Amino acid sequence: MEKLLERVNHILEALPYITKYSGKTVVIKYGGAAMAKADLKESFAKDIVLLKYVGIHPVIVHGGGPEINRLLDSLKIPTEFIHGHRVTDTQTMEVVEMVLTGKVNKQIVSMINSQGGKAVGISGKDGNLAKAVKAPIEIELEGKEKQLFDVGLVGRIESINPEILHNLQKEGFIPVISPVAESVEGDSLNINADTFAGEIAGALEAEKLILLTDTEGILIDGKLATGLSRGKMKEYIRKGEISGGMIPKVECCLAAIDQGVNRTHIIDGRVSHSILIEIFTNQGIGSLIES
């Protein structure tokens, strides 16, 4: 009986959050270990379906780097790197789009639908969802100032037209978006999935943006930091306390906040049901950044 009461208490703990977020949009960037391990994939799909059943509108933007690497290797397509960043030429971009939109996207859709959801897979090209421009990347070389490097068909979002997402949500569907967009010249461009998720969240005026990562969250002096303001994050970056791959994730969160997203979260996707823990428990998980 005690165990049953404990389960009931867990459900009751979620009630105020269900009330608060019902009818709201939550954008989730799906990537890392959560996409690789079978048990985590299943828990992710169940989390998404449960969100929909309690009236929350999840929108998913996904990555897929490891799958791209595997197919490029199997096809023996040579890859050029500039300071660790892949150069995406036309042949590589064909593989990127095929893997992200044709394979990974449909696997996620199938996974969610198998748990009782109604997911629909699209890319940034569908319904003119996203327009992008080819953009160089900024790299800070040791002992030198930041420099710009051309890495091929890699883009930056110029505009989002969320009409297709609104229509899908209105009909009860869960949008699953691959991070490929089209330039005004008609070229397919690979977009950073974190950045794309942030832009989608801003355009939808989402209540939350959640980034699933392979870390606990933002670590400052080895300790998990949360309840962080925009100003504090800028200070941490300036002082070098946030560095490497975490910087673009934080900048993505800050950009989303600037566009009106209320709360952004960087959470540990290696933890089963981390999305539900974040949204429906008092303690939450990972790092919260808010305006």
Swiss-Prot record:
Residues recorded as binding substrate, renumbered to this chain, are G64, G65, R86, N190
Residues carrying the site annotation Transition state stabilizer: K29, K249
- Give the GO terms filed under biological process for this record: arginine biosynthetic process via ornithine; L-arginine biosynthetic process
UniProt key word Iron: no
Report the GO terms under cellular component: cytoplasm
Q: Give the location in the cell.
A: Cytoplasm
State one Pfam family annotation.
Answer: AA_kinase
Per its record, the protein catalyses: N-acetyl-L-glutamate + ATP = N-acetyl-L-glutamyl 5-phosphate + ADP
The entry's family comment says:
Belongs to the acetylglutamate kinase family. ArgB subfamily.
Q: Which HAMAP family has this protein been placed in? A: ArgB (MF_00082)
- What is this protein for, i.e. what is its function? Catalyzes the ATP-dependent phosphorylation of N-acetyl-L-glutamate.
Q: What is this protein called?
A: Acetylglutamate kinase
Q: Which organism is it from?
A: Leptospira borgpetersenii serovar Hardjo-bovis (strain L550)
- Gene of this entry: argB
